[in-house]
C-alpha cells in the first residue's frame, strides 16, 4: 500500500471513524437493504421510503457522535441525506473527453439568461435528465464494475454523463464545496492530476454558469511512485472550494466524461463524483439549504 506520513492521514483519507460507526450500526442491528450489488441502498433511486427514513435516522446519530465523541478528530462526513442529484442519459463520446452534449449546452444557455429556478419536471429537451440519486457521493460505475452497484447500468468506456442539482439559499452567501471526481486509492501509486484539471477524465464543474477551477495539486505530475504520500489529491485532505450562492435558487452542473477505465497514470479510473455543500470551513453541511426535487 501507498506510503503515508502520519496516523492522522490514515484516519482522514480512509474515513475510519465514520466507517467504524457504520459497521457497528449494521453489526449491532442487522438488517439492511440488500447486498452490496443491490440497487436498493439507502439513497439510491430504488430505495424504499422506509430505507431512506432509516438512513436519515442513522445519519442523525452518526453526526451526534461526530459532535460529542469525535470532536477534534478526523471525521470526514457531513450530512447528505437531504441532497438530490439528477443524472443525464449516457452520451457516447468516441474518446473525445471535451465533447459537449445537450445538458451542457442547455445549462449554459439557461445560466446566461439567468434561469435558475428549477422546473416542475425534468426529462424533456430543456432539462434532459433521466435518473436521480440522493446523497453527495455517487458512483456512476463502481471501481469493481458490476460486482458492486453503480448508478449507470452496463456502463462502458468512452461515455459522458452530466449531474445537476438545484439548491435554494436564504441569502447571498459564501459556502464550502467538498468536491472530487476521482478518489485516489490508498493502495495504488496513481499520479496526481495535471495542473488546471480535475482528473484524467476531463471532468468540469459549474455553479450558476461559472466554471470552478480545481485546486493547485501539491504532488507534481510524474512517474507512479508507491513511496510518494498522497497530498491533496483527495477532497478529504484539502480545504473545501469556496463558492458563491445567491439568494434564491442556484444550479450546479458537473460534467463527467470517462475514457478508459484503466490508464497509465490511474490504474482504477473511477467514474464517480462527490459534491457536498458545506459551511465555508467544510465542517458541516450548509444549514437551511434546500434541494429541489422535480419529478421525472
Predicted regions and their residues:
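Beta-strand elements of well-folded, non-transmembrane domains
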Residues: 165-171, 181-185, 258-260
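Accessory carbohydrate-binding/adhesion or oligomerization-edge regions at the termini
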Residues: 57-156, 186, 217, 255-296
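Short tyrosine-centred short linear motifs in exposed loops/low-complexity segments
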Residues: 171-177, 185, 246-249
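Extended extracellular/luminal ectodomain segments enriched in beta-structured repeat modules
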Residues: 157-161, 168-178
Amino acid at each position: 500500500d501507498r506510503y503515508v506520513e502520519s496516523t492522522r492521514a490514515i484516519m482522514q483519507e480512509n474515513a475510519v471513524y465514520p466507517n467504524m460507526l457504520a459497521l457497528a450500526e449494521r453489526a449491532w442491528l442487522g438488517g439492511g437493504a440488500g447486498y452490496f450489488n443491490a440497487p436498493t441502498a439507502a439513497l439510491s433511486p430504488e430505495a424504499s421510503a422506509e430505507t431512506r427514513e432509516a438512513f436519515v435516522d442513522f445519519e442523525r446519530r452518526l453526526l451526534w457522535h461526530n459532535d460529542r465523541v469525535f470532536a477534534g478528530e478526523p471525521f470526514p462526513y457531513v450530512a447528505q441525506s437531504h441532497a438530490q442529484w439528477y443524472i443525464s442519459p449516457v452520451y457516447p463520446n468516441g474518446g473525445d473527453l471535451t465533447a459537449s452534449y445537450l445538458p451542457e449546452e442547455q445549462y449554459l444557455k439557461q445560466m446566461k439568461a439567468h434561469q435558475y429556478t428549477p422546473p416542475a419536471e425534468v426529462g424533456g429537451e430543456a432539462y434532459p435528465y433521466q435518473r436521480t440519486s440522493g446523497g453527495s457521493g455517487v458512483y456512476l460505475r463502481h471501481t469493481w464494475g458490476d460486482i458492486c452497484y453503480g448508478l449507470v447500468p452496463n456502463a462502458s468506456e468512452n461515455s459522458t454523463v452530466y449531474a445537476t442539482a438545484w439548491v435554494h439559499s436564504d441569502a447571498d452567501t459564501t459556502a464550502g464545496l467538498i468536491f472530487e471526481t476521482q478518489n485516489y486509492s490508498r493502495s495504488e501509486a496513481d499520479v496526481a492530476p495535471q495542473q488546471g484539471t480535475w482528473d484524467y477524465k476531463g471532468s468540469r464543474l459549474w455553479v450558476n454558469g461559472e466554471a470552478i477551477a480545481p485546486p493547485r495539486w501539491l504532488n507534481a505530475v510524474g512517474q507512479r511512485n508507491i513511496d510518494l504520500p498522497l497530498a491533496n489529491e483527495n477532497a478529504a485532505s484539502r480545504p473545501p472550494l469556496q463558492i458563491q450562492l445567491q439568494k434564491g435558487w442556484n444550479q450546479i452542473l458537473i460534467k463527467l466524461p470517462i475514457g478508459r477505465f484503466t490508464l497509465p497514470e490511474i490504474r482504477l479510473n473511477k467514474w464517480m463524483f462527490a459534491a457536498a455543500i458545506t459551511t465555508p470551513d467544510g465542517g458541516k453541511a450548509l444549514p437551511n439549504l434546500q434541494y429541489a426535487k422535480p419529478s421525472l
